[in-house]
Amino acid sequence: MTKSFSDRVAEGTANHGTITPAELKEKMDANEAITVVDVRDANALGEGVIPGAKNVSLGTLFYKADPQSAFHDKETFQSTDQPIVFTCAGGGQASIAASVVAEYGFTNVTILEGGTRGWSAEGLPTEQAE
């Protein structure tokens, strides 16, 4: 049976859980070792990004997160047990991203509830994408 986008989003959220924007901000303020990965395409970052977030589009995630790939992004995906929070505009693509990296053995992945829009809606700071 074919899975729809909605099925994949629901599955990712159920399997990996979410973190609220306030909880993420608290962890960031406490300087917890956490990697925030924004999986939007570069041309969709005009709304702003969470400070310190790495941009790895969903399309490139498949090879950048794969430790076996010649194109593995070792700076962003350092260790399979590192805490990673995925975000996108609203959370859907982030849910799929969490499932993708879990297939590569990453065990500590979470989805930002509401995505970057949810972050902004709470009045939390954003910055312009580089």
What residues fall within each predicted segment?
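Rhodanese-like catalytic fold shared by cysteine-dependent sulfurtransferases
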Residues: M1-I34, V39-P83, G92-E130
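Short, surface-exposed ligand- or partner-binding patches at beta-edge/loop junctions that are enriched
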Residues: T87
